[in-house]
Design a protein with these regions (language model features):
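Structure-specific nucleic-acid interaction/processing domains
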Residues: 1-143
């Protein structure tokens, strides 16, 4: 099963983004899951006695979330019964965490276990993680 963003099939994502917030929907019972996924991560390798860091693409193309109940349903019912949608592409990790929590609170995922697989919300972010000078200059509500 593929990822969709704004109704379009996604096969590649611009490398300027670090990850995305997603919504997975079970078509059989309507339950949903909101989560986030990084597109790449850092690995280290010992080269000539020094640690070298490099980036490795994550498993985002085949990813179905970290929730065990959701993954169990995907195995039992098959990937064809689930839709994977990208809600928000994010440039920074802090922005990614912020928007994941924002969507989870917006949808009240903890109040409706019959509608959502999400069992907990974990976020720790600071204003500096999401606000940059460029972003502040774009805001029109600041005088």
């Amino acid at each position: 099963m593929s990822w969709f963003y704004e109704g379009n099939l996604v096969e590649e994502i611009d490398p300027k983004y670090c990850g995305f917030v997603y919504l997975i929907t079970n078509h059989l019972n309507g339950r949903k899951y909101i989560g986030k996924k990084l597109l790449q991560f850092k690995k280290t390798k010992q080269v000539k006695g020094k640690k070298k860091r490099f980036f490795v693409e994550s498993d985002w193309k085949s990813y179905y979330g970290s929730n065990q109940e959701l993954n169990g349903d995907v195995k039992v019912h098959g990937e064809d019964n689930f839709k994977r949608e990208i809600l928000k592409l994010c440039i920074k990790k802090g922005e990614l965490s912020y928007y994941e929590a924002k969507y989870q609170f917006e949808y009240d995922v903890l109040y409706y276990p019959e509608k959502f697989y999400n069992a907990w919300i974990m976020v720790k972010i600071r204003r500096s993680h999401i606000l940059t000078k460029a972003l502040l200059s774009e805001r029109t509500d600041i005088q």
